[in-house]
């Protein structure tokens, strides 16, 4: 049984957490994030510590307790440090470019794939086989990174495709001759 919901969140210097109704707002050096939390969970800010209490003991409320605490903790971490995902393109002729607000992927299809970046996310392409996605919202960064990876997810025989940095691809052996 997890007890993440009972852990307190220590606020670093320069971070403010406020609540209006069910909307939690976190302000920090890198920006501001807002998120709606469930009315079944109450949040209290005492000095530089944030605590969460739940209204009951049924399974839904217990699940929301830990999830809400984790979401607010990710908001605090995002406005202080930010989040970053790095993707690698593996395959002959696979490359990426970033022009304007479009990420252009050449990954073996007949035409290049163009993806528009979300407003909350920053994209860098240091070399044509590496894509760095960063931002203060963990959800937005992870969702966009997953969208990019889904364009050509790694295949198990040669490992070609778009993968996360440090992702291990389970390789299959090909067919053997008679």
Swiss-Prot record:
Domain of life: Bacteria
GO biological process terms, semicolon-separated: cytoplasmic translation
PROSITE patterns reported in the protein's UniProt record: RIBOSOMAL_L6_1
Record-linked Gene3D superfamilies: Ribosomal protein L6, alpha-beta domain
InterPro entries: Ribosomal_uL6-like, Ribosomal_uL6-like_a/b-dom_sf, Ribosomal_uL6_a/b-dom, Ribosomal_uL6_bac-type, Ribosomal_uL6_CS
Pfam families registered for this protein in UniProt: Ribosomal_L6 (PF00347)
Biological function: This protein binds to the 23S rRNA, and is important in its secondary structure. It is located near the subunit interface in the base of the L7/L12 stalk, and near the tRNA binding site of the peptidyltransferase center.
Subunit structure: Part of the 50S ribosomal subunit.
Protein's recorded name: Large ribosomal subunit protein uL6
Organism: Limosilactobacillus fermentum (strain NBRC 3956 / LMG 18251) (Lactobacillus fermentum)
Lineage start: Bacteria, Bacillati, Bacillota, Bacilli, Lactobacillales
């Amino acid at each position: 049984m997890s007890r993440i919901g009972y852990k307190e969140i220590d606020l670093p210097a320069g971070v403010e957490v406020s609540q209006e109704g069910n909307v939690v707002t976190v302000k920090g050096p890198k920006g501001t994030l807002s998120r709606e939390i469930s009315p079944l969970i109450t949040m209290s800010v005492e000095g530089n510590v944030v605590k969460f209490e739940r209204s009951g003991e049924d399974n839904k409320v217990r699940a929301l307790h830990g999830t809400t605490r984790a979401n607010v903790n990710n908001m605090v971490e995002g406005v202080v440090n930010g989040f970053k995902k790095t993707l690698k393109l593996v395959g002959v002729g696979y490359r990426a470019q970033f022009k304007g607000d479009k990420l252009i992927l050449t990954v073996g299809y007949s035409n290049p794939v163009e993806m528009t970046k979300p407003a909350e996310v920053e994209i860098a392409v240091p070399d044509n086989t590496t894509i760095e996605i960063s931002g203060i919202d963990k959800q937005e960064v992870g969702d966009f990174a997953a969208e990019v990876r889904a364009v050509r997810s790694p295949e198990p025989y040669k490992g070609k495709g778009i993968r996360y940095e440090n992702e291990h691809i389970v390789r299959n052996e090909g067919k053997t001759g008679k």
